[in-house]
């Protein structure tokens, strides 16, 4: 720093005075006192409240303003070379642990009384303030580029902000000291975990690099051009550049980038200055200006420009919102903009510095919106008059969201202006800490390059995207498509994490340097990428998806689990191990035994040694293997990854555990960093099927399965507006299993009749509860078994009557009706045959899909259904084609390899199926549980009119049931011939609400009023239940 600027500690008294001239206007009255006392730079850095009072600064607010600016100078003087993201994380972690230790020490003292509700002591609040100050310093780094553009750091920033807000709320709550301390301890532990996560990312060069200073000179500035910089000021006086305008002097020098802090202007330190004083300093010399900028870490490669160094854009006021040519990479301004002469202090947070104005800007309204005329001028691309608002006003929001404006076949990239911002907000707060930043403005056009993804995978996933944004080079390379989505989850065929898979929201971009990205494209695509591809232009794209045909060859090669234990061969280490499952309920098994095979630094596990497909695998070089001392199970070890998840295993004996640990460490140690998993391979993959298994010992009190546990195809997950958002918790593995089961079912229905129906897989059996919630399959029908076992297994499907066929293949809407109104009526003679066939009522053997009860579903052909049921929308037919092609690709080499399932304990499986179906061993329905009551309100029908009627029916049924209970209580009293006054008084006190309700209802016996009251209650209940359905 000594070569670029003189340290603040060596300032002379005249330099201190020059620096104070740029502070707030209210502080100018004290400059003479500083000049008279000859305060040097070293004295300035160590100044205190008492010394300020001796200098005549008697007001506390003025003292705080000076000390805030001095704090910024201290950070610049002492922390420039040592401050980085890791050190700031260490400081925050230390502050959190200090606060924890302080609370623990207070509780150990003999005078501690946690039951009091008095205010916390001052030393306690001081520790809280120190913790928040350390968090602010960390947020000052996370809140701007390059960290603000990385998803992981953006999520971390949001977590830290949320925890700090929670901490400030806790200390102001009126509760006991013990409760307050418990809440603060929880926040401190969470903050420590966040800091440990940042510290663990030591391999990321951005975490360990510190900031540096750089001197930039802008010369030959034209009077009509201006500097072309966007500057945003924090409340305490940091000045951050948020971008440059296209072809401006700041853009042409190629050294000014978003996130840079302005430290000096013409060798005068401007840290802590007002923004208007900074602007005056920039305009002081019309021929040029010398800037000293503080730059955040960008990239490890200093020879190649980082992607963030290409940030430039036109002011939004100069950008017409009309479709642009796909080949135009550089656009020219269509009009000029003037500069404000004077604005209030609250509006000086953001400033664009173009040529001098012809007249003042038009003020905003109280919400900060532009006048309608100006906005209409922007929308149609007309030139803006000279009195228009600064273009940077569009970039001056605290929280900005991007959204798509679709006009015919054009997708535009725009900003949404925040309307809730107050214009009277002060520029500074009273805390002396520094670095409290607002999020920086982001550009309209920028060379963001997303993570590379397999083009075949992107084509397969394209039908699940809601919107597409394409950035294409001048050569129009088809593989360079980067899709952006905001609020959607990708439904993939496996529950696998990929090395390059991150959120594809607009806030996440790759930080690979340009040369590395070029090398990556040339290596994968095999096509040369010239330098012109570094600058991507916006491409209009139609919202119509591309071809929905899936790549058959790519599907078969993606999964590493689709390999049998025999084909895998003898591994480096084999044996039985216990694996801990993610328990979904209290009664579910925590551990399950698998056959494990260690092969080529990958760990596979199978159900048995003859299994045709691995239940899961992990790539060990990406995981850390160690003893799992936190597990209660003996001889446990774990494979953990800070960004993915942890797997826990356990051996039977200590020798087995040591053997596995030694063998795994030997294999993984030989893999160098460059030989680890490639980007298109998986970190890990695991099936969720074992997690849905019920315990081996059935429990009578275990709750039944929820209605929405049957997975849905991806096409139905977000397409229908009537699907609950709660169902998004289903894993992608379950979705894949559901698709494959439907495809196998359809193939067996339309295939040869030589396949025995007893060999149906258990995944095809479904209960009534599953059927209620399950949407249409690819064939548009539900497969439902309603016949007795003897008819379903040992009879030919052609001998079934059309009524039975129609009843066994019901669409979703009819299943809803059948659930509420009873089964569809059969012919009287047929019903008697069914009842008399086994001497009882017909039984349904549609067991839950995860049970081991080996019965089959009826192969009802689609042609036997109701003609109305055969009508499918085009989307369903297209999905059926895609799934058939996918099934054909997946089943290459496996079509004739069906193996016999092992028959389990039929009685045990039957009991388990009855338990999950909420039936007693005698076939009677059990008392509903809380889960059933809760999920009974989220049953949905695809027809909104029918859905509303079903809601009304449920409400009336529940109301009728409640009234019947009240009548039974009343009858109990009225039917008692020996009723005494004392007993009646006790009954009255016990059912006081019911008694008052009776008294009120007896006063109004008018039938019209009663019916209107019922309608009002019903309508209100309908509204309430609709709200619950939307938001639960």
Curated annotation (Swiss-Prot):
GO biological process: intracellular signal transduction; postsynapse organization; postsynaptic specialization organization; regulation of signal transduction
Gene3D superfamilies reported in the protein's UniProt record: 2.30.42.10, Pleckstrin-homology domain (PH domain)/Phosphotyrosine-binding domain (PTB), Transcription Factor, Ets-1
Pfam families: CNK2_3_dom, CRIC_ras_sig, PDZ, PH, SAM_1
Domain CRIC: 84-178
InterPro entries, per the entry: CNK1-3_SAM (IPR049628), CNK2/3_dom (IPR010599), CNKSR (IPR051566), CRIC_domain (IPR017874), PDZ (IPR001478), PDZ_sf (IPR036034), PH-like_dom_sf (IPR011993), PH_domain (IPR001849)
Entry comment describing in which tissues the protein is expressed: Expressed in neurons and localized in the cell body and neurites.
Region (Disordered) residue spans: 324-349, 480-509, 682-766, 866-900
GO MF term (any one): identical protein binding
Keywords from the named record: Coiled coil, Cytoplasm, Membrane, Phosphoprotein
Membership in a protein family: Belongs to the CNKSR family.
Protein task: May function as an adapter protein or regulator of Ras signaling pathways, in synaptic junctions.
Protein name, per record: Connector enhancer of kinase suppressor of ras 2
């Amino acid at each position: 720093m000594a070569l670029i600027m003189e340290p603040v500690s060596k300032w002379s008294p005249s330099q201190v005075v020059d620096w104070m001239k740029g502070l707030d206007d209210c502080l100018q009255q004290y400059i003479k006192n500083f000049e008279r006392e000859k305060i040097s730079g070293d004295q300035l850095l160590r100044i205190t409240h008492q010394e300020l009072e001796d200098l005549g600064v008697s007001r506390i607010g003025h003292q705080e303003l000076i000390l805030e600016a001095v704090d910024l100078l201290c950070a610049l003087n002492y922390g420039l070379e040592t401050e980085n993201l890791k050190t700031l994380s260490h400081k925050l972690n230390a502050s959190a642990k200090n606060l924890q230790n302080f609370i623990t020490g207070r509780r150990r003292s003999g005078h501690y009384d946690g039951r009091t509700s008095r205010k916390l002591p001052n030393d306690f609040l001081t520790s809280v303030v120190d913790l928040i100050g350390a968090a602010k310093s960390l947020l000052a780094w996370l809140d701007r580029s390059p960290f603000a553009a990385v998803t992981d750091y953006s999520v971390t920033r949001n977590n830290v902000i949320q925890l700090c807000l929670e901490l400030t709320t806790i200390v102001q709550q009126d509760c006991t000291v013990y409760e307050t301390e418990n809440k603060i301890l929880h926040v401190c532990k969470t903050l420590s975990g966040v800091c440990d996560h940042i510290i663990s990312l030591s391999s990321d060069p951005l975490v360990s690099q510190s900031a540096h200073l750089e001197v930039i000179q802008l010369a030959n500035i034209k009077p009509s051009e201006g500097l072309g910089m966007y500057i945003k000021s924090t409340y305490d006086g940091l000045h951050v550049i948020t971008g440059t305008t296209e072809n401006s002097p700041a853009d042409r020098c190629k050294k000014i980038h978003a996130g840079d802090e302005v430290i000096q202007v013409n060798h005068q330190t401007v840290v802590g200055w007002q923004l208007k004083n900074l602007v005056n300093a920039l305009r002081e010399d019309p021929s040029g200006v010398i800037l000293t900028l503080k730059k955040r870490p960008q990239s490890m490669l200093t020879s190649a420009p980082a992607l963030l160094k290409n940030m430039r854009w036109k002011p939004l006021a100069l950008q017409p919102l009309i479709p642009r040519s796909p080949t135009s990479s550089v656009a020219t301004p269509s009009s000029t903009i003037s500069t404000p002469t004077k604005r209030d202090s609250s509006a000086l947070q953001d400033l664009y510095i173009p040529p001098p104005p012809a007249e003042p800007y038009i003020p905003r309204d109280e919400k900060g919106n532009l006048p309608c005329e100006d906005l209409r001028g922007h929308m149609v691309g007309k030139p803006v008059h000279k009195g228009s608002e600064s273009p940077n006003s569009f970039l001056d929001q605290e929280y900005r969201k991007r959204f798509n404006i679709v006009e015919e076949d054009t997708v535009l990239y725009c900003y949404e202006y925040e309307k809730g911002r107050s214009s009277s907000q002060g520029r500074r707060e009273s805390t002396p800490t520094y670095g409290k930043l607002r999020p920086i403005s982001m550009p309209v056009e920028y060379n963001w390059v997303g993570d590379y993804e397999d083009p075949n995978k992107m084509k397969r996933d394209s039908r699940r995207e809601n919107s597409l944004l394409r950035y294409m080079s001048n050569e129009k390379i088809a593989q360079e498509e980067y899709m952006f989505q905001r609020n959607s989850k990708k439904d993939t065929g496996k529950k696998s994490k990929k090395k390059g898979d991150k959120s594809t929201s607009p806030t996440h971009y790759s930080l690979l340097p340009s040369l590395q990205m070029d090398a990556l494209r040339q290596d994968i695509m095999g096509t040369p990428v010239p330098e012109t591809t570094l600058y991507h232009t916006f491409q209009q794209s139609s919202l119509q998806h591309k071809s929905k045909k899936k790549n058959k060859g790519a599907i078969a090669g993606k999964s590493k689990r689709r390999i049998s234990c025999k084909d895998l061969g003898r591994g480096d280490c084999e044996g039985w191990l216990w694996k801990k499952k993610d328990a979904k309920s209290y009664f579910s098994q925590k551990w399950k035994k698998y056959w494990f095979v260690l092969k080529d630094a990958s760990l596979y596990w199978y159900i048995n040694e003859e299994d045709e497909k691995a239940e899961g695998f992990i790539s060990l070089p990406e995981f850390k293997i160690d003893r799992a001392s936190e597990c209660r199970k003996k001889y446990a070890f774990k494979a953990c990854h800070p960004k993915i998840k942890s797997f826990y295993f356990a051996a039977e004996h200590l020798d087995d555990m040591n053997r596995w640990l030694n063998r795994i460490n030997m294999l993984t140690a030989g893999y160098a960093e460059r030989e680890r998993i490639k980007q298109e391979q998986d970190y890990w993959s695991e099936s969720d099927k074992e997690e849905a298994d019920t315990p081996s010992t059935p429990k009578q009190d275990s709750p039944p399965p929820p209605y929405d546990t049957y997975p849905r195809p991806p096409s139905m997950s977000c397409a229908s507006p009537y699907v609950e958002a709660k169902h998004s918790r289903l894993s992608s593995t379950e979705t894949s299993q559901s698709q494959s089961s439907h495809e196998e079912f359809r193939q067996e229905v339309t295939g040869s009749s030589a396949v025995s129906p007893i060999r149906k897989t258990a995944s095809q059996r479904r209960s009534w509860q599953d059927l209620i919630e399950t949407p249409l399959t690819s064939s548009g029908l539900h497969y439902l078994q309603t016949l007795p076992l003897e008819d379903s297994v040992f009879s030919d499907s052609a001998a079934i009557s059309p009524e039975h066929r129609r009843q066994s293949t019901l669409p979703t809407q009819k299943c809803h009706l059948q659930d509420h109104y009873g089964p569809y009526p059969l012919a009287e003679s047929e019903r008697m045959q069914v009842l008399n066939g086994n001497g009882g009522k017909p039984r349904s053997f549609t067991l839950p899909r995860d049970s081991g009860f080996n019965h089959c579903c009826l192969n009802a052909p689609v042609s036997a259904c109701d003609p109305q049921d055969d009508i499918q929308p085009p989307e369903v037919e297209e999905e059926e084609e895609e799934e058939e092609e996918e099934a054909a690709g997946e089943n290459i080499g496996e079509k004739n390899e069906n193996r016999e399932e092992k028959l389990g304990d039929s009685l045990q499986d039957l009991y388990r199926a009855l338990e999950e179906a909420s039936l007693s061993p005698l076939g009677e329905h059990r008392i509903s549980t809380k889960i059933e009551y809760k999920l009974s309100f989220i049953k949905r029908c695809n027809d909104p009119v029918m859905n509303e009627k079903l809601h009304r029916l449920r409400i009336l049924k529940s109301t009728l049931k409640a009234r019947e209970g009240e009548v039974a209580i009343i009858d109990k009293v009225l039917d008692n011939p020996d009723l005494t006054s004392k007993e009646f008084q006790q009954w009255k006190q016990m059912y006081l609400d019911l008694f008052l309700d009776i008294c009120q209802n007896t006063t109004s016996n008018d039938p019209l009023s009663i019916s209107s009251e019922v309608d009002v209650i019903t309508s209100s209940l309908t509204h309430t239940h609709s709200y619950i359905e939307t938001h639960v």
